[in-house]
Swiss-Prot record:
Quaternary structure and interacting proteins, as annotated: Interacts with BMP2, BMP4, BMP6 and BMP7 with high affinity.
Keywords: Disulfide bond, Glycoprotein, Secreted, Signal, Wnt signaling pathway
Biased composition (Basic residues): 188-206
Signal peptide range: 1-23
Subcellular location: Secreted
MF (Gene Ontology): BMP binding; BMP receptor activity
Residues carrying covalently attached carbohydrate according to the record: 47, 173
Pfam family, one: Sclerostin
Classification via InterPro entries: Cys_knot_C, Cystine-knot_cytokine, Sclerostin/SOSTDC1
Name recorded for this polypeptide: Sclerostin domain-containing protein 1
GO CC terms: extracellular space
Lineage, broadest ranks: Eukaryota, Metazoa, Chordata, Craniata, Vertebrata
Tissue: Highly expressed in kidney at renal collecting ducts level and weakly in brain.
GO process annotations (BP): BMP signaling pathway; canonical Wnt signaling pathway; cell fate commitment; epithelial cell fate commitment; hair follicle morphogenesis; mammary gland bud morphogenesis; negative regulation of BMP signaling pathway; negative regulation of canonical Wnt signaling pathway
Length: 206
């Protein structure tokens, strides 16, 4: 058994050792938890972000689709060059006019389209109504005709200068003529029947 003086000298040593142990445990726990990384909740990647990355950052909104469904439409204009003749007389210079024919098509499809046009309308693909190209503007032009006898004639003709798209429905194709109701004709009495009736009456009297 140790003397009391040794016990007193061991107490401070035990206290120092206990402090060091606590400090070691605290340091270890702090070091341990410092390396723990909290799990970050993974955000589900939406289809829009994937499409944006694949398409080079382009956004496709619903408004863009709506605009594509309704596009401007215009006529397919044709230029015609012809000579006017009347009997033995023919025009000296050819006549250039505009022919409005064919269907109405979206403007980007039409040839020589530069981003606009006269007489454009909005055309919907879902619409059951049909658009047709018709004459819009005309002007009167004088043209001279040269005859074989050396004389000249001057004529006034109408030339088309602009076309437009006109909407036609099924009712336009149906005939709009109102037929007048014909009253039923009264049965005409023949003269022979009258004569027979008169003869029968005479025989009955006799």
């Amino acid at each position: 058994m140790l003397p009391p003086a040794i016990h007193l000298s061991l107490i401070p040593l035990l206290c120092i050792l206990m402090r060091n142990c606590l400090a070691f445990k605290n340091d270890a726990t702090e070091i341990l938890y410092s390396h723990v990384v909290k799990p970050v909740p993974a955000h589900p990647s939406s289809n829009s972000t994937l499409n944006q990355a694949r398409n080079g950052g382009r956004h496709f909104s619903s408004t863009g689709l709506d605009r594509n469904s309704r596009v401007q439409v215009g006529c397919r204009e044709l230029r015609s060059t012809k000579y006017i003749s009347d009997g033995q007389c023919t025009s000296i210079s050819p006549l250039k006019e505009l022919v409005c024919a064919g269907e109405c098509l979206p403007l980007p499809v039409l040839p020589n389209w530069i981003g606009g046009g006269y007489g454009t309308k909005y055309w919907s693909r879902r619409s059951s109504q049909e658009w047709r190209c018709v004459n819009d503007k005309t002007r009167t032009q004088r043209i001279q005709l040269q005859c074989q006898d050396g004389s000249t004639r001057t004529y006034k003709i109408t030339v088309v200068t602009a076309c437009k798209c006109k909407r036609y429905t099924r009712q336009h194709n149906e005939s709009s003529h109102n037929f007048e109701s014909v009253s039923p004709a009264k049965p005409a009495q023949h003269h022979r029947e009258r004569k027979r009736a008169s003869k029968s009456s005479k025989h009955s009297l006799s």
